[in-house]
Amino acid sequence: MKTTNKTTVMKDRKAMLSLLWIFVMFNFTYADILTLYFNNVLQKEAWKLFQSGYVGSVHITQGFVLLGAILLETSIAMVLLSRILKYRANRWANIIVGVIQIVANVQSLTGPLFLNLFYVFFTAIEIACLLFIVWYAWTWRQPEGAVLTSAQSSS
């Protein structure tokens, strides 16, 4: 009969979530690199578009760029947070950030200006992985025998 240490199961779940966030980040990165490298519109027109302050109908402001940076940073932070947060905070952080990232990814597909087949492919992989992260965190149950103190349950 196989016995499993509850602490090991918890650490394995944390490690898997962290690894999934790394996978998502690599997909984000390479989708953007390939878009910048292979998209003719970006190669020829990006500077003019950004200088005008608009890309398509989107007004590029410091606030817009900051929002993009925050979205990227939340994914980067989840690599670390998935490893160090306690059960309850970890579970909810993965669910909330995963859902936010799914919405952002779906939104990125609505603008036709820079879409390429490879971008759609990467985004589909990202969304599938993010859906798995949300499901994996959602189905994560408190380890049996673990009793949360009031201080732990608030974290």
Q: In which residue ranges do the predicted regions lie?
A:
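Hydrophobic alpha-helical transmembrane segments of polytopic
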Residues: 20-24, 67-71, 93-101, 122-125
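Juxtamembrane helix-break-helix junctions at the cytosolic face
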Residues: 72-92
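Membrane-helix boundary connector in multi-pass membrane proteins
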Residues: 90, 103-123
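Cytosolic juxtamembrane helix and N-cap/initiation of the first transmembrane helix
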Residues: 1-28
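Hydrophobic transmembrane helix segments
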Residues: 24-65
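Helical transmembrane-bundle signal
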Residues: 21-32, 75, 79, 98-108, ...
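Extramembrane terminal tails and long inter-domain/linker segments of multi-pass membrane proteins
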Residues: 1-9, 141-155
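Membrane-water interface at the C-terminal end of transmembrane alpha helices
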Residues: 128-148
